[in-house]
């Protein structure tokens, strides 16, 4: 009898271990593609033949991109100033053009796959089970999280920061929301810094690589990526990032996924120095990008 009880105990223990391993793999490793996104490149006919490209700039009749490197707070900061003739050139893309759990791809790979001119990493929605996910007016996830702030990119190219809790994605889409990204927080709202030195201590007080997007006025955007976690570049707190973007004149600015995800890609090359949590120079695979292109 004791042997049988011991045997059943071993069997139960093995089953429990197997189940636990499966849950962990299913949550963090196994890729599950729920929706394949067929992105039609409807803007090809607007592409201009008159293109001027340098190491840090791109210009045609519809798109102007200028990249400048700054050095503040013992940190290397890369700023892309983007001016568009139409909001259709501000776009987003999923890894492998598929929405789903653990579906990831490097920012550079997504940029190249979508013929982007410029790109940064997005909100890495796949790392969380909650948070609104809206792309190109399609609601992929409507489960909200407590008090997280979202970035709404409207069809006219304007940006807004909203509180996710209580937000109605269907109503937002009806009102013109094209993309909703869920990471945050908002850095600048209505031309005022929206974080303080003492707020959101878990994020804001740590110096890290950062990615952010902001808008100065109609179709005039600022993208910022900072290096961090190295002796050469310390990284920014959220307050330092917000202050920096405010000084650039943005009216709205929003913090995207940072840390090892922070990547700025331009015209076939990575501009910043992506850094893992272990201090290794390596580009991380993520769920999505925000990009400029036709």
Predicted features by range, described:
Residues 95-99, 165-169, 226-230:
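Short, solvent-exposed aromatic-acidic interface loops
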Residues 2-150, 160:
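Zymogen propeptides
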Residues 77-81, 150, 186, 212, ...:
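Conserved hydrophobic/aromatic beta-strand scaffold that supports enzyme active sites
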Residues 100-103, 170-176, 206, 232-238:
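A short, polar/proline- and glycine-enriched secondary-structure boundary/capping micro-motif
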Residues 58, 123-204:
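Active-site-adjacent helix-turn-beta-strand microarchitecture at beta-sheet edges
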Residues 129-145, 153, 198-215, 220-251, ...:
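Conserved, well-ordered active-site substructure
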């Amino acid at each position: 009898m004791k042997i049988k009880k011991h045997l059943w105990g071993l069997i139960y223990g093995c089953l429990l271990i197997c189940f636990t391993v499966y849950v962990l793999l299913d949550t963090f490793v196994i890729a599950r593609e729920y929706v394949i996104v067929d992105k039609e490149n409807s803007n090809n006919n607007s592409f201009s033949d008159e293109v001027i490209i340098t190491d840090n700039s791109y210009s045609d009749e519809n798109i102007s991109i200028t990249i400048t490197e700054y050095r503040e707070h013992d940190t290397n900061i890369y700023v892309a100033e983007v001016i568009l003739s139409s909001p259709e050139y501000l776009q987003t893309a999923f890894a492998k053009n598929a929405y789903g759990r653990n579906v990831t791809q490097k920012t550079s790979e997504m940029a190249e796959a979508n013929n982007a001119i410029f790109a940064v990493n997005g909100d890495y929605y796949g790392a969380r089970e909650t948070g609104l996910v809206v792309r190109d007016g399609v609601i992929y996830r409507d489960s909200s999280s407590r008090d997280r702030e979202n970035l709404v990119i409207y069809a006219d190219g304007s940006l807004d920061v909203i509180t996710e809790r209580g937000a109605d994605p269907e109503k937002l889409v009806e009102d013109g929301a094209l993309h909703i990204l869920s990471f945050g927080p908002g850095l600048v709202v209505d031309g005022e810094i929206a974080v303080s030195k003492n707020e959101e201590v878990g994020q804001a007080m740590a110096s890290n690589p950062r990615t952010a997007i902001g808008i100065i006025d109609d179709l005039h955007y600022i993208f910022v990526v900072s290096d961090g976690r190295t002796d050469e570049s310390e990284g920014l707190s959220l307050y330092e990032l917000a202050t920096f973007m405010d000084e650039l004149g943005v009216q709205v600015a929003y913090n995207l996924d940072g840390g090892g995800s922070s990547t700025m890609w331009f015209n076939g090359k990575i501009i910043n120095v992506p850094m893992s949590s272990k201090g290794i120079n390596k580009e991380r695979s993520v769920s999505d990008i925000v990009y400029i292109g036709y």
